[in-house]
């Protein structure tokens, strides 16, 4: 009977993961590539339990979605943000691996090259 219980537990886990992914899919932007979306969805799903909206509707989910966009925009588009905000999202994303990220040159790096 233990094998049957284990199989049921695995099926329940898989079902929960599927439901979470289906829930997150509604937040995908039409302009996101598959690579960008998979990374951002991992960010969202990782923190979703901590950012579920309470009954008073205080917008915790909106905050999580905004943080996920800050992280994705920084990673994939090279956008810059306030240091505290960037530190927060980078800490939240710790352990999420994204391959073949674009390389960006900052304005200050360009200015240093120009002055040399």
From Swiss-Prot:
Family matches, as InterPro entries: XTBD
Signal peptide: none
Pfam family name, one: XTBD
Protein name: CDKN2AIP N-terminal-like protein
Domain of life: Eukaryota
Native species: Homo sapiens
Family statement drawn from the similarity comment of this UniProt entry: Belongs to the CARF family.
Keywords per UniProt: Acetylation
Keyword Endoplasmic reticulum: no
Subunit architecture: Interacts with XRN2; the interaction is direct.
Modified residues (N-acetylmethionine): 1
Ranges of residues in domain XRN2-binding (XTBD): 24-116
